[in-house]
Amino acid sequence: MPRRGGIPKRDVLPDPIYGSKIATKLVNQMMLDGKRGVAEKIIYDAFEIIKEKTGKSPLEVFDAAMKNVMPVLEVKARRVGGANYQVPVEVRAERRQTLGIRWMVLFTRKRAGKSMAEKLAAEIMDAANNTGATVKKREDTHKMAEANKAFAHYRW
């Protein structure tokens, strides 16, 4: 293993329209085959739909949705004496955000019918209202961590 310092973390540039770094991260996660323009169009269209339907700022709604989908705890597999234990660990802030965005995009893609922008807008609005598949995924993750609380002393 190389002994040089760690690789510096590259910071994302804020989104050109909303000036938000988290919106840029959503664009990056949504992007397929390097087609940033397509991903940006989907997200901006989704934000317009949110603005029309809620009458609020789309970034406010998106931030509320992100707060509802970011996990606080998760489980990690740890091998002890030939047995694998699911050990609950706290999620770092950076990973919380990444998981929230990743799950949101995943469940947006799984939604049926309509355009991608409509599906994303619906998923964001559902998450902001504490409903939807993304919020359920977070709750399931927390339940797993709670169920395996007995193995918390195996943390490293």
Swiss-Prot record:
Lineage of source species: Bacteria, Bacillati, Bacillota, Clostridia, Eubacteriales
Function: One of the primary rRNA binding proteins, it binds directly to 16S rRNA where it nucleates assembly of the head domain of the 30S subunit. Is located at the subunit interface close to the decoding center, probably blocks exit of the E-site tRNA.
Keywords: Ribonucleoprotein, Ribosomal protein, RNA-binding, rRNA-binding, tRNA-binding
Name of the molecule in the record: Small ribosomal subunit protein uS7
NCBIfam families on file: rpsG_bact
Similarity comment text for this entry: Belongs to the universal ribosomal protein uS7 family.
CDD domains linked: uS7_Bacteria
Domain of life: Bacteria
Cellular component annotations (GO), alphabetically ordered: small ribosomal subunit
Species name: Desulforamulus reducens (strain ATCC BAA-1160 / DSM 100696 / MI-1)
A GO MF term: rRNA binding
